[in-house]
């Protein structure tokens, strides 16, 4: 636990430095864009004088327009996550919103929960009715998939973008088929880049469901076609999902939707510390927001 606290502290300092660096780079980027605009504009004038009928003039004008569009400041701040949306409008309701993690230009449509635990939560995973197959390959987990947002996996690339821009906490809400509910919260949640095989950093548990996720701390992501676990076999194949498997799991939120008690071992939507390895939960939702 002491090692985890040290890691959380160092991670917090790293993110602060990265955000400061990012802000500095953004400022440099605008100045650089202005210089590019000036140079390209000068080139347009020169080309118009020496090559009045040339296609170069039109091409350079197009370049100037592109640079100007890329460097124009936005009229309104763009939300990075659901917490920003809630902060900008305290009356926001749960639903789909567009966010811009890592300053991606085209935006990302996400499901926001504005009701649970003071709201501002961004849903990264959801199981509710078994309508979607989660036994998928690496690329699908990398970029995400959903079924009209009834069930979804946001995508590992987006998880990395989101959790690299600030310190995030994770909340996992779950229910069984007998109508009982439990939750687990983690004060630290981060997903590494694809170069790290989306390495998981998680810790600081509290809640009522028991801590089934901390044993996955430091694990790499595995799917049925990419084996990064610590077992001799393939955990993703054996337990029918994609996750940060170790040897193999104590949490399997992306397993088969088996509707309660099942005879097979640990291949359902399992949370070991609550209902064990032979009970598949009715619902489970993983959500994040910045600390």
Model-derived regions, located:
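Assembly "stalks" and propeptides
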Residues: 2-118, 179
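Extracellular beta-rich globular recognition domains, centered on the fibrinogen C-terminal
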Residues: 74-217
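Short secondary-structure subsegments characteristic of cysteine-rich extracellular domains
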Residues: 143-147, 151-153, 248, 253-259
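Conserved, non-catalytic sequence blocks in retroelement Pol enzymes and Pol-derived host proteins
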Residues: 145, 224-226, 274-277
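Surface-exposed interaction patches
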Residues: 184, 194-257
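Mature hydrolase/peptidase catalytic cores and their serpin-fold inhibitory cores, especially
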Residues: 220, 261-265
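C-terminal helix/juxtamembrane-tail motif
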Residues: 265-291
């Amino acid at each position: 636990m002491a090692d985890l606290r040290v890691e959380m502290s160092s991670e917090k300092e790293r993110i602060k430095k990265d955000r400061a660096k990012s802000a500095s780079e953004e400022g440099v980027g605008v100045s650089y864009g202005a210089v590019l605009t000036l140079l390209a504009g000068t080139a347009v004038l020169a080309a118009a004088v020496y090559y009045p009928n040339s296609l170069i003039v039109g091409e350079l004008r197009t370049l100037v327009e592109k640079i100007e569009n890329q460097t124009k400041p936005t009229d309104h701040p763009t939300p990075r996550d659901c917490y920003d949306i809630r902060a900008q409008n305290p009356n926001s309701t749960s639903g789909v919103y567009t966010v811009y993690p890592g300053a991606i230009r085209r935006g990302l449509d996400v499901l926001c929960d504005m009701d649970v635990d003071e709201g501002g939560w961004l849903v990264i995973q959801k199981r509710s009715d078994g309508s979607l197959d989660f036994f998928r390959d690496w690329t699908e987990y990398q970029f995400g998939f959903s079924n009209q947002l009834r069930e979804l996996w946001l995508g590992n690339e987006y998880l990395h973008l989101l959790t690299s821009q600030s310190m995030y906490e994770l909340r996992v809400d779950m229910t069984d088929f007998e109508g009982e509910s439990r939750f687990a919260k983690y004060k630290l949640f981060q997903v590494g880049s694809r170069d790290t095989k989306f390495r998981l950093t998680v810790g600081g548990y509290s809640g009522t469901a028991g801590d089934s996720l901390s044993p996955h701390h430091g694990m790499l992501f595995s799917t049925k076609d990419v084996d990064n676990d610590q077992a001799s076999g393939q955990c993703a194949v054996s337990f029918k999902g994609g996750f940060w498997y170790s040897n193999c799991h104590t949490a399997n939120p992306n397993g088969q939707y088996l509707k309660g008690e099942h005879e097979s071992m640990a291949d359902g939507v399992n949370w070991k510390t609550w209902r064990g390895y032979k009970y598949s939960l009715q619902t489970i939702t993983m959500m994040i927001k910045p600390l």
